[in-house]
Design a protein with these regions (language model features):
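NTP-binding/hydrolysis catalytic cores, primarily Walker-type P-loop NTPases
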Residues: 171-220
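Walker B beta-strand of ABC/ABC-like P-loop ATPase nucleotide-binding domains
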Residues: 73-74
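P-loop/Walker-type NTP enzyme "switch/lid" segment
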Residues: 1-68, 169-176
């Protein structure tokens, strides 16, 4: 996330420094250059990520909500079900699973749903990432309806495959700030749904020659 947000060069302390009392919580938090109310608390940069326990993570999330008065605390979980996953869900009261339209990814997501429910996180939601309408139409990619039928949880957003994400990541400029990018629109819609708005799902655009040309010249 530090790279995506363009904050990687401003990291001095990280989450391990906080739990080991090497710095105060507010010292480790990096304020975004564009939004005053947006902060990043970096993960461990060099040390073992198991240095943080689920108990410490739960306390940390509580401090962010109460002492720092954060409206939302979003914990980005690493892939898999190892210690990083256990830490991520320790202080969570809501879970959003991000998956892709691949059979193996959907199986993993289904397994994660079971683990979340076993930990008391009921009613998780799902984001379907990197979906392409043309491949779905050809039968080369799982469709949204098929995935939701398998997972049996609510859909909170779909994100189309977008080459602009690579460009925005390399520039350290979140694509959500790009008004012309479909993926940016998708992310903004997801954020609004998280905040309680009822929005229809965006219609997927088939990636044909015309749409690729528009993206190339900056018309879409």
């Amino acid at each position: 996330l530090d790279v995506v947000m363009g904050l990687e060069n401003r990291i001095v302390y990280d989450i391990v420094d906080v739990v080991e009392n090497n710095c105060r919580l507010e010292q480790a938090m990096i304020r975004d250059k564009r939004y005053d109310g947006l902060y990043l608390l970096p993960a461990a940069q060099t040390r073992d990520k198991t240095s943080v326990t689920p108990f410490q993570m739960k306390e940390l999330v509580g401090d962010l909500k109460e002492e720092m008065e954060m409206d939302y605390v979003i914990v980005d979980s690493p892939a898999g079900i190892e210690q990083g996953f256990k830490n991520a869900i320790a202080g969570a009261d809501r879970a959003i699973i991000v998956t892709t339209p691949e059979i193996s990814a959907v199986r993993d997501a289904d397994r994660i749903i079971g683990l979340l429910e076993a930990e008391g996180l009921r009613d998780p939601e799902v984001i379907i990432n990197r979906i392409r309408a043309d491949m779905v139409d050809r039968g080369d990619m799982m469709g949204i309806e098929d995935m939701i039928e398998i997972l049996a949880i609510d859909l909170i957003g779909i994100v189309p495959e977008d080459e602009g994400i690579v460009v925005s990541t390399n520039k350290g400029e979140p694509i959500a700030l790009n008004d012309k990018a479909k993926a940016g629109e998708a992310y903004r819609n997801i954020a609004r749904r998280i905040m309680g708005e009822d929005l229809p799902m965006m219609k997927l655009e088939k990636d044909n020659f015309i749409t690729r040309f528009k993206k190339l010249v900056g018309l879409s």
